[in-house]
Amino acid sequence: MEKKKQNKSRYISGLNGLRSIAVIGVIFYHLFPNQIRGGYLGVAVFYVISGYLITDHLRQEWQSTNKINFKEFYLRRLKRLYPALLAVLVVSSAYITLFQRNLLTNLRGIVFSSLTYTNNWWQIRHGLSYFDRFNNESPFTHLWSLGVEGQNYLLWPIVFFLLMMFVKKKKHIIQFLFAATLISALFMGFLYTPGSDPSRVYYGTDTRLFSLWLGNLLAFIWPSTHLRKDIPLKAKHLLNLFGGVALLLLGVAFLYLDARYRFVYYGGMYLISFVIVVLVAVIAHPGASWDKWLTNPVFTYLGQRSYSLYLWQFPVMIFYEAKVKNINKNLWLHTLIELILIFGISELSYRLAEQKGKKINWHALKMAGKSWFTKPTLTLATLKKAASLFVILSALVGIVFSKTESTTAEQQAFQERLAESQKLAEQSKNQGNTNDAEKDTTKEESKKPESVTPVQLTEKQILAGQTLSITAIGDSVMLGATAHLQEVFPKMIIDAKVGR
């Protein structure tokens, strides 16, 4: 079939700036969840960008050839994403096998689901929570998002092809995509249960697809190759204003939109995705200034490495914080060390896995492996290969021999702590109902602070805590912290239950 004329594809450097903001938001959300309460929305930013760029590329290919090369599309995605993912899975599994064997439980299922881009559904099936800081310390929790994106990579090119073949009219395609995003958002609201852990709707492909497909929708409305640089000055100012307002709203959401708010699941995340769509549209327009404003060496560096940064940030935090105790005593020092480790390892991942993975020659790699085993010589190159082989074998041992259980070791330990805390909570509740007379303690006794778990309180605050009469009602999180709370607040009456 004769090729149609196609406008030259554009590289939108400003999107690296948006990627850098997104990945920094996610990292600092995991480091400071009580301060950067909406940093998790960085994932929605990645989704909108991904949906826009992939659909924009598919449209250009269709306009040029009237077909979609599915094999090339999937191979290109695998070469782009798989090497770095394999690296983080292998290295982290080897570390767990050698140094942190309490995390071996279900390792095989985690790795398999991550490699097949089904980790989000695996975590849902096993009842794992993204928001439970006490119970879920897996270094692979964040890989749920790759599952959603990977499933979209598999599904969307097929849907795109069918739409272009049978629907054809742009107007009807836009209507279909918009309806699909609304259905996904409605699923999120329908499946969300107020007061319960929102991980099911947070992880689900069905409830998160709207961010990706809003990006797809934008590519039909706002194709990058059809946008003109020479636009009226008034239009340029208007675009810049929209971009500024969208970026401001996104920044406020990053700081304040707590994932525990009902609003997030009753349309809030959908609205934020719309805000991101506006921001991506303005950055993509060559007539606006935001592409230039978000293009600088720092943003370019972070944006190009955002995938590796996202992959490595959680394993580094989990492994580091498991080995280093009392981090709160020198919080900023330990945070700096974690950031240095994250950026250092991500740089290695970017250079050795992402960059080289795109150009890897599997046949040459196979022949090199054969020659090394037949004629091993002690050189720096062979030592590197031996070290790599040791890491891979360590990972395989852990993956093959890991236990498969419906609950993880951390969940089992947590259930035991919950049982103990339940007893303490009942004692506290009964004590509060029957021993009101004990409030008449002497001033000397009330001034003696009991030995409490270090929580960065001053002596004055500890003294005040000894005298406060507090009633606390909560769920399993409060139940798990009962012992520590009663050390600080001995007169506290705690009424906590699992699943409240």
Question: Where in this protein do the model-derived segments appear?
Answer:
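Membrane-interface helix/loop caps of multi-pass membrane proteins
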Residues: 1-364
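Extracellular/periplasmic envelope-modification machinery, especially enzymes
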Residues: 325, 355-500
